[in-house]
Amino acid sequence: MPVVSAQSDLEALSLTFVTEHAAPIERVWQHLVDPGLRAGWLAGGEIAPEAGGTVALQFHNATLSGDDDYAPPPKYAAYNGPMPMRGRVLACEPPHRLAFTWNEPEDGEGSREPSNVTIELSRDGDRVRLVLTHARLASRDGLLGVAGGWHAHLALLANRLEGRPVGGFWRLHTRLEAEYDRRLPR
């Protein structure tokens, strides 16, 4: 598994993942900001390159996997087809830091508070260290789904960067979410 470490703070409802990649920092950065490259491990769509800009991601998790994958669990059925996610860029400092709000409500969608995602890249010898923090999650259940999701997406990123087969997103997500559920206190 490419994740070096994963930590959660249930009181703050936040997650932090650390991964390392044998790739130039500029190449890892491109996989964060280029819609075509990002669509291969997370979601297509646009992320404006400046603070205050729009994030308009288009998830299509069914297209991330090879033929070995299976349908998502029933509670995630709506997430298998095209699914938009909107946010605002909080910081864009190429090639080191990208931060944005996650799941901002559209007009008329109520007043839920968005969560925040921060991705930081740094050189560590001949490797790149990626630290992803997702903060201000709404609940433990939400944290479990996000933990399984980010862990699986980061595994896909590592496979893309290293030229390995991507593997089954939903199979991995389902296994990881169950593992986080066992490990995180209730």
Identify the residue ranges that each predicted region occupies:
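Hydrophobic ligand-binding cavity/cleft-lining segments
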Residues: 1-51
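Intrinsic-disorder/low-complexity, polar/charged segments enriched in Ser/Thr/Lys/Arg/Asp/Glu/Gln
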Residues: 12-18, 54, 84, 97, ...
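A short, structured loop/turn motif at beta-sheet edges
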Residues: 25-26, 48-51, 90-96, 120-129
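Short beta-edge strand/loop motif at the mouth of beta-sheet-based domains
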Residues: 35-82, 169-175
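Short, charged/polar surface micro-motifs in flexible loops or helix N-caps
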Residues: 37-38, 60-65, 91-98, 106
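Short coil-to-beta-strand transition motifs
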Residues: 79-86, 114
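Beta-strand/loop substructures that line and gate deep hydrophobic ligand-binding cavities in soluble
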Residues: 91, 101-157
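A conserved amphipathic terminal alpha-helix motif
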Residues: 135-186
